[in-house]
Amino acid sequence: MELHVLNHPLIEHKLTVLRDKNTPSSTFRELVSELVSLEAYEATRNLEVVDKPIETPVAPMVGKQIAKPRPIIVPVLRAGLGMLDGMTRMMPSAEVGFLGMKRDEEHPTQQITYANRLPDDLSGRQCFLIDPMLATGGTLVTATHYLMDKGAKDVTAICIIAAPEGIKFVEENIREDINFRVVVCGVDEGLNGKSYIVPGLGDAGDRLYGVID
């Protein structure tokens, strides 16, 4: 597993505003989208490209274009939806799939899958999983293995913040027969008794969309 923790003044500034409990949902959504666009630069560093002959107004040349089959962006519902615009802004030609998962509150590292909208065959596709929080790591491991069971061999996970416990769980449990990377804006102190990241930013889904009882 490759872990990339981004270090940039813009990311640090935006992440601080994002964490502030007084930041309204509208601003929170904008910041999530902006942070993901900044993360996308590093996350797509290994994006596969092919030669593309073109003509400029001055002369012919051979440039590059994203290879086919197109990469697929997979937000983990519901909080991952808040990251989607930031990714599609950078890769408008990418396909989008959806994966619905929620934490089993009695067993925090176990997940319940309640929805999916993905191609049956992901062989040869570069997959980008997006989920704001890497807390226990259970969601990320389950989601990645779900993609691998459909043939994926190249998965990049993009999260905003992570806990050391979650990173360790992913390292120990992700299957080895895959190219797997994790890109995050920051790694926090750890998890509290409820498996929330500390200091964290609260429940990302609630702050994006409001609490649903």
From Swiss-Prot:
Primary enzyme class: transferase
Biological role stated in the UniProt entry: Catalyzes the conversion of uracil and 5-phospho-alpha-D-ribose 1-diphosphate (PRPP) to UMP and diphosphate.
EC code: 2.4.2.9
SUPFAM superfamilies in alphabetical order: PRTase-like
UniProt cofactor note: Binds 1 Mg(2+) ion per subunit. The magnesium is bound as Mg-PRPP.
Protein name per Swiss-Prot or TrEMBL: Uracil phosphoribosyltransferase
Activity regulation description: Allosterically activated by GTP.
One Gene Ontology molecular-function label: uracil phosphoribosyltransferase activity
This protein's pathway: Pyrimidine metabolism; UMP biosynthesis via salvage pathway; UMP from uracil: step 1/1
Binding site for uracil: 197, 202-204
GO biological process, one term: uracil salvage
Entries under PANTHER family matching the protein: ADENINE PHOSPHORIBOSYLTRANSFERASE, URACIL PHOSPHORIBOSYLTRANSFERASE, CHLOROPLASTIC
InterPro entries per UniProt: PRibTrfase_dom, PRTase-like, Upp_B, UPRTase/APRTase, Ura_phspho_trans
A UniProt-annotated Pfam family: UPRTase
Binding annotation for 5-phospho-alpha-D-ribose 1-diphosphate: 78, 103, 131-139, 203
